[in-house]
Regions:
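Extreme N-terminal starter segment of soluble prokaryotic enzymes
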Residues: 3-5
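Acetyl-CoA-dependent GNAT
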Residues: 8-12, 19-80, 86, 104-105, ...
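Hydrophobic adenine-recognition pocket in adenosine-nucleotide-binding enzymes
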Residues: 9, 88-90, 123
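Conserved acetyl-CoA binding element of GNAT-fold acetyltransferases
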Residues: 79-92, 144
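Conserved acetyl-CoA-binding loop-helix of GNAT-fold acetyltransferases
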Residues: 87-90, 96-109, 136
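Conserved active-site alpha-helix within GNAT-family acetyltransferase domains
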Residues: 101, 113, 125-143, 148
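Conserved GNAT acetyl-CoA-binding A-motif
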Residues: 104, 111-123
Length: 150
């Protein structure tokens, strides 16, 4: 097994990233890997925002994982900056290899180095395996989340 590189995602990575986003029952309903146009536009917006970090994990030239880290400056908690981890995906062949833990470790270390005081994430209620994974990494299910589609 070769060395792992975690780096900023590029347009060339989009087919692999979107394929991972679509590779589960929830993602299959909302993602469109056959049309990368909206994803290219989204990547341009992410790249233009210094608080956005879309990264990929690459081994032997192959994208095998991804996540998005968003920094959120705020007033609460004495003006704390939070980091939000989203869209954590691991290629099906790499699940159970420890890669997810390494990506989350990268996100925590990066958040700390950028001055964040807290890292948070949400996970769909149906992803009970993911919930256990995050709890093993020290995350606490402390809040109930709500969404409103616009």
């Amino acid at each position: 097994m070769g060395d792992l590189e975690i780096r900023r995602a590029t347009a060339a990575d989009l087919p692999a990233v979107v394929a991972m986003l679509a590779d589960d029952p929830l993602g299959a309903q909302r993602e469109s890997p056959q049309d990368l146009t909206p994803y290219r536009a989204a990547l341009e917006r992410l790249d233009a925002d210094a608080n956005q970090h879309l990264v990929v994990a690459v081994r032997e030239g192959r994208v095998i994982g991804t996540l998005q880290l968003t920094l959120i400056p705020g007033l609460s908690h004495r003006g704390a900056t939070r980091a939000l981890i989203e869209a954590v995906r691991i290629h099906a062949e790499e699940r159970g290899s420890g890669l997810g833990g390494r990506l989350i470790e990268w996100a925590i270390d990066t958040s700390r180095s950028l001055g964040c005081q807290m890292v948070q994430l949400t996970s769909d209620k149906s992803r009970t395996d993911a919930h256990r994974f995050y709890e093993r990494l020290g995350f606490i299910a402390s809040h109930e989340g709500f969404k409103l589609k616009l």
